[in-house]
């Protein structure tokens, strides 16, 4: 397992919903597979992958393990557009309804993935978005979006709710 993945790790933040750091190598993907992950929603940009060939090696390992992936590249420390949150949340929610065990990740598993995971929990459990974020944080204390990302979560919710 990579030092990065060992340090930042991942946690289950909902029924069959996990969030955390990005896998950097085949051992990291194997750890996800051992945790029962069957689908991954990736929020990382290509420029964030530190290891040469890291993304390609992970894609191959995911494919070999039968783990599907969808991806929306979101700038680290940046804003999450309502459309990106909606796409990610709907995709993850659909997977959960299909019986998948889903892993949502950004680089360190603290900001972007926390916003998307909170959006999923809000939709799945009928919670207000900040209440959903607190639920995520109870299960993964390092989940801590930046203040503007919390505002992005609220803006997404306001734009999707009449």
Where in this protein do the model-derived segments appear?
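Non-catalytic nucleic-acid substrate-recognition regions in nucleic-acid-modifying enzymes
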Residues: 1
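A phosphate-binding catalytic loop at a beta-strand-loop-alpha-helix junction
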Residues: 99-118
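Cysteine-based protein phosphatase catalytic domain of the PTP/DSP
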Residues: 4-8, 12-101, 124-151, 155, ...
């Amino acid at each position: 397992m990579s030092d990065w993945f060992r340090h930042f790790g991942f946690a289950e933040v909902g029924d069959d919903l996990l969030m955390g750091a990005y896998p950097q190598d085949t051992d990291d993907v194997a750890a996800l597979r051992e945790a029962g992950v069957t689908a991954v929603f990736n929020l990382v940009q290509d420029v964030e992958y530190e290891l040469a060939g890291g993304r390609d090696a992970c894609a191959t390992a995911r494919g070999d393990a039968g783990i599907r992936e969808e991806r929306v590249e979101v700038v680290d420390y940046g804003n999450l557009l309502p459309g990106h949150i909606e796409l990610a949340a709907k995709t993850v929610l659909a997977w959960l309804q299909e019986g998948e065990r889903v892993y949502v990740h950004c680089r360190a598993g603290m900001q972007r993935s926390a916003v998307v995971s909170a959006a999923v929990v809000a939709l799945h459990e009928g919670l207000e978005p900040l209440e959903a974020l607190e639920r995520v944080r109870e299960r993964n204390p390092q989940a801590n979006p930046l203040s503007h990302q919390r505002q992005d979560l609220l803006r997404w919710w306001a734009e999707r709710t009449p």
